A protein has these predicted regions:
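Short, small-residue-biased leader/transition segments that mark boundaries at the very start
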Residues: 2-9, 363
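Transmembrane-helix signature of 12-pass secondary carriers
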Residues: 10-361
Length: 363
């Protein structure tokens, strides 16, 4: 039976043509990890956009309250939780490549929806969509990279996923800084103040915030929001936040275009009994004489897939927990994920300017 299987695999390797033009793994990884870059950008961009969103509608802002501020961050996290849970099932059913194509569309829809939102209530559902794409990408990109890359470079390729997430956050902060500088920071032009506190003129957001108790003034946050609402405002730089949020449509479009040229995961094809498609995809990304022979790689995949297919979901978990080294890997991975979240890193990513202000560090 084993010999027959190997003969069938050899025959498929000899007779099957590549699924398309040769693709270097570096190019495949660069395209796929645009999903990771979008993950980082979309989680980091909101921190720089919030100061402009605080401004009144007349200044181009959304007149955010403290509750709105928390909900904007929370809706993305809510969507990401669902995306993380469902994204893996989607990629198992439809394929890693196909899933990334869908997520690229969701990234574009979410970015355009949030950037064009006329009110915070319209923004919320699009933040959930964006969060879903973020969560599903985090569950799909590493799997696609690990299943597509050869053994000799698998560690480096998968590590690129984490690098691109952090690079996406850095890109978000850099874009925010550039757009904020181009607009001169958050400001508004007051034409009239019924309370008489302000004379007509242009005021920076920092100047106005000095009136609140958290900045040494006399107004509570609620009173300050009511004060802003009653001002007559003719213009302002609040619209800058829309540019910050819409920028991520560019890598999302690049992801959609690029993934159309990339091969599907060979392991996904094999898990669906598609041997020739498996070989065709491997031929597209393997270098003959450098990587492991395709016959050996497919044989190993078939054997592993056969062993896994004979076990129920509960039995597969039992195999993982019975083995000391796999159990240790699982527990260490869970521990690192929990520690990473309990550091409060997400708070800084979403609300960096607010955290710095409350720390009495003015930026």
């Amino acid at each position: 039976d084993r010999r027959q299987r190997q003969m069938c695999i050899r025959d498929s390797v000899v007779t099957t043509q590549p699924a398309g033009p040769k693709r270097r793994m570096g190019v495949v990884a660069a395209v796929a990890t645009l999903g990771s870059l979008l993950f980082g950008y979309d989680t980091g961009v909101i921190s720089g956009a919030l100061p402009f969103m605080y401004l009144p509608h007349g200044a181009g802002g959304l007149a955010l309250t403290v509750g709105h501020e928390g909900a904007i961050g929370g809706t993305l996290t809510l969507g990401a939780a669902f995306g993380g849970l469902i994204g893996g099932m989607m990629s198992d059913r439809w394929g890693r490549r196909h899933n990334l194509l869908i997520l690229a569309v969701l990234f574009v829809v979410g970015a355009l929806g949030t950037a064009g939102a006329p009110s915070v209530w319209v923004m919320y559902p699009f933040r959930v969509v964006l969060g879903f794409a973020v969560g599903a990408a985090s569950a799909t990109v590493p799997v696609y990279l690990s299943e597509t890359s050869p053994k000799r470079m698998r560690g480096r390729i998968v590590a690129l996923d984490q690098f691109m997430i952090v690079f996406g956050q850095l890109l978000a902060f850099s874009v925010n800084a550039a757009i904020s500088a181009a607009h001169g920071g958050p400001s508004l032009m007051v034409t009239a103040d019924p309370t008489g506190r302000l004379s007509p003129g242009t005021y920076s957001w920092d100047t106005l915030q000095a009136m609140t108790t958290s900045h040494g003034g006399a107004m509570t946050d609620q009173a300050f929001h009511a004060f802003l609402t009653q001002l007559s405002v003719s213009a302002g730089s609040g619209g800058a936040w829309r540019w910050m949020l819409v920028v991520c449509t560019l890598p999302a479009i690049a992801l959609w275009i690029g993934m159309r040229k990339m091969p599907e995961s060979a392991r996904w094809h094999l898990s669906h009994g598609q041997l020739r498609e498996t070989v065709a995809c491997l031929k597209q990304v393997r270098v003959e004489g450098v990587d492991e022979p395709i016959v050996d790689e497919v044989t190993e995949m078939v054997e592993l897939n056969g062993e896994g297919g004979r076990l129920s979901h509960r039995q597969q978990w039992a195999v993982v927990m019975e083995s000391r080294w796999t159990r240790r890997l699982l527990l260490v991975g869970i521990f690192l994920a929990v520690v990473n979240q309990t550091t409060g890193v997400n708070t800084v990513m979403y609300y960096a300017p607010k955290v710095l202000e409350l720390s009495l560090i003015h930026i």
